[in-house]
């Protein structure tokens, strides 16, 4: 029944809205839930496209929350504020380019070789351990404590870490946050920059998946479009809450809890993968 597929879209939207921004891997959660909750009447090609395109709902939440800061044409902005906005966009572009270029050519290869329970589990655990290590080591005061002072070189270094997010289970936000922490960027600054960095990456990835879907001879029916819109709408609403939560959270807390969660989830996925293998 179509009503069940709408309900499934809502579940996917909730998961996307939460896991896209928290550094806990949206892929790790989607690959698990797909074994239990699936659309009965949709093709694998549609699901591959669906899982990426619903991210547009999440990224629209960033645009809405930070619209004034991201809009260089906002009335009333001083020349200095306009300049800062353009500089911010320039840093976002610099950081986005490495993953965009590599992803364009190797995304299918990464997905074919690493989109499985074991690979995702390993990346969840590895980055979980990285978060815990980074937070427990001796800390120097962050060199970058506001976004305006983020050097272009550091933005590029964060972008290079984002390439690692091509490995399913890494987490795009997780990779960029680790990159920022290693390069002396404060938690709040790297978290906010991660939000902005998602704008070109997610729009580009979604456009690419839609193009591939259509080029391979697939069509989108009204029902499929509706399911996409439902999931995107839910992801948008949930993201509005999660982004505000994470922004406040990192001002007072570190990322240790997310590291522990990743290790726990990775362990659960490894056990689940072993059980599946034993059961044939």
From Swiss-Prot:
Cross-referenced Pfam families: BacA
Matches recorded under InterPro entries: UppP
Record's GO cellular component terms: plasma membrane
Regions that span the bilayer: 2-22, 45-65, 86-106, 114-134, 147-167, 188-208, 223-243, 255-275
Keywords from the named record: Antibiotic resistance, Cell membrane, Cell shape, Cell wall biogenesis/degradation, Hydrolase, Membrane, Peptidoglycan synthesis, Transmembrane, Transmembrane helix
GO molecular function, one term: undecaprenyl-diphosphatase activity
GO biological process annotation, one example: regulation of cell shape
Family note: Belongs to the UppP family.
UniProt-recorded name of the protein: Undecaprenyl-diphosphatase
Species: Streptococcus sanguinis (strain SK36)
């Amino acid at each position: 029944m179509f009503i069940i597929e709408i309900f499934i879209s809502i579940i996917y939207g909730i998961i996307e809205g939460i896991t896209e921004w928290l550094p806990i891997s949206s892929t790790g959660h989607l690959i698990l839930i797909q074994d239990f909750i699936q659309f009965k009447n949709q093709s694998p090609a549609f699901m591959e496209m669906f899982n990426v395109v619903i991210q547009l709902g999440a990224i629209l939440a960033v645009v809405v929350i930070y619209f004034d800061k991201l809009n260089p044409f906002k009335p009333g902005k001083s020349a200095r504020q306009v300049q800062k906005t353009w500089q911010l966009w320039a840093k976002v572009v610099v950081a986005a380019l490495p993953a965009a270029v590599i992803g364009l050519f190797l995304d299918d290869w990464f997905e074919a070789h690493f989109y499985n329970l074991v690979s995702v589990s390993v990346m969840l655990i590895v980055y979980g351990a990285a978060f815990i290590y980074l937070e427990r080591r001796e800390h120097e005061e962050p060199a970058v404590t506001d976004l305006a002072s983020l050097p272009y070189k550091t933005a590029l270094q964060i972008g290079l870490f984002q390439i690692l997010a091509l490995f399913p289970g890494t987490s795009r936000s997780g990779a960029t946050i680790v990159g920022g922490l290693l390069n002396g960027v404060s938690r709040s600054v790297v978290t906010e920059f991660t939000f902005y960095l998602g704008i070109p990456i997610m729009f580009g990835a979604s456009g690419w998946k839609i193009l591939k879907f259509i080029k391979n001879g697939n069509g989108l029916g009204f029902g499929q479009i509706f399911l996409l819109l439902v999931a995107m709408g839910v992801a948008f609403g949930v993201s509005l809450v999660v982004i505000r939560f994470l922004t406040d959270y990192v001002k007072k807390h570190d990322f240790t809890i997310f590291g522990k969660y990743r290790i726990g989830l990775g362990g659960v996925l490894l056990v689940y993968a072993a059980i599946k293998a034993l059961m044939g």
